[in-house]
C-alpha cells in the first residue's frame, strides 16, 4: 500500500493504472475505520484492479455546533485496517489540498437534502456533495463504493452522478452490524458502556416495525417512536419514513420505503434505517452481520 497526501502524488499513482487500462475503485471515508469500511474495501478489491481509499474529515459537512473536533481520528490504526482490507493507494489530504482557495465553489443539493438528517443539519449534504464531487474529479474512479448505512447520502450521491454525467458506477453495499444488531459506526466509540447496551435497541425497533402489516407510513413511524420513548438513555432526534430512493413523502406505498431514525446519546448521535418492501413484510432488505460478509458480494450498482 502506498500513502499519499497531495493531489499531485495521487495523480502520479493513478497515471500508470490508467495507462495500463486498469479499473480503478474508490472508497471515500472520514477515517476511524472499522469492519464496515473494511467490507467496502474488500468489495472494491473484488471488483477493481486498483483500490483507492481516501481519509478526510470534511469540515464543510459539519455544522457550527456539531462534532467536527470530536470526530475520532486514528490514522495509524486506519493505515493498518485499510491495507489489511486490500487498499492499494491511501489518500490522506489536508484541507488545503481539497479546498485550496477556501469554500469558493460548492454544490447545492435540493432533492432529498432537507429530510431525515438534512432537516436538522442545514447545508450538511451540500458539504457531502461538494467533497464527493471533488474526490471523484481527483480519483476519476470507474466504481465508487458506499455503505447503505448512510442511505440518504447514497441516494443523493447517485443523483449527483446522474445530474453531472459523471462516468462512475456507484456501488451500495449492505450495512455491516455487530452481532447484537448495532450498525458499525465510527461514532460508536463515543458511547458510554451503558449507552452501548441500549444502542442495539434502535435497530430492533426498526425491525419490529418492518414486520407490521400496516400500509400507513405514519403507523410505522409511530411504532418506532413508542419503542424508543421507552429507552432509559438518550433521546429521539427523528423517526421518519419516505419512498426510496426518491425520498418523497407519501402516506402509503407499494414499493420500497426507508424507515429511518436518528438518536442522540450524550456524545454520539447515531443513525439507522431499514428498507422495507411494502409488498413483502417479513423484514428489511438491508441486513448483514459482521460475521456474514459473504452478503457483501450482493452489492448493487447503478
From Swiss-Prot:
GO function terms (MF aspect): ATP binding; pantoate-beta-alanine ligase activity
Domain of life, source organism: Bacteria
Which residues are ATP-binding? 30-37, 147-150, 176, 184-187
Q: Pathway involvement?
A: Cofactor biosynthesis; (R)-pantothenate biosynthesis; (R)-pantothenate from (R)-pantoate and beta-alanine: step 1/1
Q: What is its main location?
A: cytoplasm
Enumerate the residues binding (R)-pantoate.
Answer: 61, 153
Cell location: Cytoplasm
The reactions it catalyses are: (R)-pantoate + beta-alanine + ATP = (R)-pantothenate + AMP + diphosphate + H(+)
Q: What class of enzyme is it?
A: ligase
A GO BP term here is: pantothenate biosynthetic process
Active site (UniProt): 37 (proton donor)
Any keyword ATP-binding?
yes
Q: Subunit notes for this chain?
A: Homodimer.
Reported function: Catalyzes the condensation of pantoate with beta-alanine in an ATP-dependent reaction via a pantoyl-adenylate intermediate.
- Extra facts: The reaction proceeds by a bi uni uni bi ping pong mechanism.
As for family, the record states:
Belongs to the pantothenate synthetase family.
Instruction: Please report the name of this protein according to its UniProt entry.
Output: Pantothenate synthetase
Q: Which organism is it from?
A: Shouchella clausii (strain KSM-K16)
**Source gene?**
panC
Amino acid at each position: 500500500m502506498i500513502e499519499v497526501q497531495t493531489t499531485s502524488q495521487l495523480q502520479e499513482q493513478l497515471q500508470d493504472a490508467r495507462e495500463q487500462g486498469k479499473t480503478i475503485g474508490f472508497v471515500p471515508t472520514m477515517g476511524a475505520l472499522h469492519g464496515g469500511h473494511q467490507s467496502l474495501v474488500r468489495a472494491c478489491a473484488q471488483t477493481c484492479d486498483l483500490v483507492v481509499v481516501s481519509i478526510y474529515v470534511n469540515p464543510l459537512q459539519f455544522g457550527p455546533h456539531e462534532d467536527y473536533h470530536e470526530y475520532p481520528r486514528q490514522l495509524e490504526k486506519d493505515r493498518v485496517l485499510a491495507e489489511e482490507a486490500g487498499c492499494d493507494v491511501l489518500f490522506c489530504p489536508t484541507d488545503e489540498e481539497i479546498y485550496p482557495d477556501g469554500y469558493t465553489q460548492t454544490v447545492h443539493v435540493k432533492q432529498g437534502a432537507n429530510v431525515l438528517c438534512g432537516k436538522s443539519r442545514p447545508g450538511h449534504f451540500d458539504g457531502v456533495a461538494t467533497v464527493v464531487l471533488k474526490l471523484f474529479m481527483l480519483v476519476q474512479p470507474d466504481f465508487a463504493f458506499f455503505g447503505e448505512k448512510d442511505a440518504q447520502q447514497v441516494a443523493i450521491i447517485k443523483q449527483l452522478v446522474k445530474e453531472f454525467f459523471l462516468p462512475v458506477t456507484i456501488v451500495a453495499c449492505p450495512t455491516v452490524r455487530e452481532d447484537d444488531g448495532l450498525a458499525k459506526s465510527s461514532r460508536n466509540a463515543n458511547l458510554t458502556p451503558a449507552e452501548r447496551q441500549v444502542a442495539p435497541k434502535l435497530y430492533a425497533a426498526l425491525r419490529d416495525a418492518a414486520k407490521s402489516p400496516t400500509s400507513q407510513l405514519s403507523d410505522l413511524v409511530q411504532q418506532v417512536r413508542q419503542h424508543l420513548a421507552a429507552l432509559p438513555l438518550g433521546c429521539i432526534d427523528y423517526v421518519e419514513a419516505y419512498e426510496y430512493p426518491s425520498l418523497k413523502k407519501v402516506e402509503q406505498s407499494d414499493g420500497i420505503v426507508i424507515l429511518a431514525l436518528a438518536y442522540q446519546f450524550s456524545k454520539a448521535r447515531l443513525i439507522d434505517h431499514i428498507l422495507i418492501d411494502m409488498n413483502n413484510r417479513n423484514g428489511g432488505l438491508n441486513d448483514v452481520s459482521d460475521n456474514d460478509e459473504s452478503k457483501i458480494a450482493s452489492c448493487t450498482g447503478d
